[in-house]
Amino acid sequence: MDTKQKKRSHSETNGSQKAPKRQKIQKTSKKQKKAAPKKPVAVDSLPWNEVTMPDMFEDAEGFYGLEEVDDVEVVRDGDVVTFVSSKIQTKNNEDEEFEGFGDEVEDGGNAATDNTGEVKPILKPTEESTKNDVPQGNKQKIEKKAKPEKKDKKEGSNTEEGEEKVPSKKEKKQKQEKPQKQPVDKDATLKQDPLKNVFEALDEDAAGEVEVSGWVELDLSSNTLMALSKMGFSKPTPIQSEAIPEVLAGHDVVGKASTGSGKTLAFGIPIVEKWLEVYGELDEDELKKSTRPPTALILSPTRELAHQLTEHITTLCKGMPTSPYVAAVTGGLSVQKQQRQLSKADIIIGTPGRLWEVISSSNELSAGLKQVRFLVIDEADRLLTDGHFKEAEEILNALDRTHGNEDDDEEDTLPPRQTLVFSATFHKGLQQKLAGKGKQSFKDDSQSMEYLLKKLNFREEKPKFVDVNPISQMAANLKEGMVECGGEEKDLYLYSLLLHHPNQRTLIFTNSIHSVRRLTPMLQTLNIPAHSLHSQMIQKARMRSIEKFSRTNNTGSVLVATDVAARGLDIGGVQLVIHYHLPRTADMYVHRSGRTARAAASGSSILLCGPEEVVGTRRLVAKVHAQNALHGEGKKSKFYIRSLDIDRRVVSRLKPRVTLAKKIADSALAKEKKGHDDDWVKNAAEELGVEYDSEEFEALGGGRKGRGTGRRMKEKEARGMSKGEVGALRAELRALLAQRVNVGVSERYLTSGTVNVNDLLKGAKGEWLGEVEGIGMEDD
């Protein structure tokens, strides 16, 4: 009898599960819906559309009148060509399918099946209506039962399709015993002591805000002042206090200020103010529905600077009731996503290459950019250099381009556009190469302004020129130094400088990508947290390196980068900049050194100077600090770039470490390069239809002598190291790194050295065993 009762209860549970069973059939029926079959059609019956020519296409000639069609397959059988498409059939049946769906929703009775017995999908509104009929007390139970069913469908089970898994008794008991989650009372803490907790909440909100009385003179809106208060800016910088009123007054502005002086907000605040003036009273729903042209277009020379500008302006707009939509258009990211963002963007920030690629393929985007109210060119001296950014010139020409059939009245309907240009260096003489021969002419500010006026189409004849530091381009709190060393000893002195500045965020600049790829693994082998950044890295890897380097808890990190990181990057806490190579131009030295000593902070810039770089270093000092010498201003010290003396005895103790690390890093780099070269030659041989033999190819090229022979021999030697030899070198280096560098302890007489034995007994930590003097940067 007991078994029968169990069977009956089991059948009752099956009978009670009919409604979920229909839900299962309903969802599987959607998957079984077949696509419309494709049939051969005539060419004339296809829905041809006329091709719209882009505005950037200057000479179309015979390409006018082209037509295109989508979703068509071309099938060729011998000499017979047929066109296969499903478009005509879908057009004929489109209305019938829509009417059928509407009838099924209204019937509600036999909506799941028709006369033929075929399963049809049930729309979601019927499910919602059944939920509304259930009392509120039982809604939670129904929802809880529905959630495990979704998990079973995702995970899959042994039951066949269309059947439903019957819950066991244990599962039922667990569901019944499981207590329901009671809603959390968010105001529980306030109920305990309302007055106390309310004022604590107000104190927490106001903790990060500062007084913004210094911004009142600029006549900014209350939303902008509140945002500046949350960002912690109590007063404007000199470039902001002079440039913002001119921009708000409607003038074209050329702004020059030292690195780290707040040039981003100098043009970002007026742009946001103008947007709030025009669209600030609209709600979010009205903003989504409205179609409006972008307010500003900002051009940047590098991807990293573009993303940083986006972050700064987005932070400024955060917390406002209504704020502009900021979109970044850079390479390395999805083009389709950027096109969607541009369709609703109010402020567009991008690099010239990707921006030109996106807008040149869309007439709507190019037409919208012609209506921008602000054109901002950040780091203008770099963007407008001849032969560097061809796309930037194309974009500037496209913004001013008008068709011949357009009337002059249509041109007047476009809103007036302000052109804002900002950089730390406008001097043309700073862009000349330091390694060149002969005398190089200096150009004054008037010639630099003429250069800009030729490149840009300013609305005013003479834009407002704002120069807050006409004498020096360098930051006031920056200390500059130089270490003289041999060309092959730069790695050794670089490691010594890093050990002399422990727990300092350091940025190392090189002139080549190869140097970045070589130095980064070498420093990592020496237990230094080094990261790399160069233009051949994918965008995600570049952003990941900057993120790891700029973490607040990673103060001793090192970033080895090319000049791609020299302009505009604002990474907090960078205290030291090391120039592994002499910069090619003086303006690049200014921008490299500007990554430290930003705002009111202090920093150091050290140049590693080899014998072949002495002439270039003299020219660098003459160009960068010439105005200081003429005006008798600047630093009080005898030299503008002081020569630093590093103890040669200390450097010699570090040489075994660096030698081992170089061998390990060079071996890995040579093997990687060999594999890359072999793949390239092998692919070329396959394309030519020639058999490739690596040994024969290497034998043919081995007899050649000339430039690069010594380098190739070293690479071959490093490539020939086995795993065992590399492992032995790593073990030897590990033993050296485990010991502190002995710079003051006598191995024979313990008490005769300069080391404090008491500190040794206490277990004092550090890289040095003994006292090491500074390198002289601390002295004024």
From Swiss-Prot:
Q: Main localization of the protein? A: nucleus
Q: Which residues bind ATP?
A: A257, S258, T259, G260, S261, G262, K263, T264
EC number(s) per entry:
3.6.4.13
Basic residues: bias regions: 19-37
Chain positions of motif DEAD box: 378-381
* Compositional bias ranges of the Basic and acidic residues kind: 140-157, 164-192, 712-721
Q: Which SMART domains match?
A: DEXDc, HELICc
Q: What is this protein called?
A: ATP-dependent RNA helicase mak5
Question: Could you tell me which species this protein originates from?
Answer: Sclerotinia sclerotiorum (strain ATCC 18683 / 1980 / Ss-1)
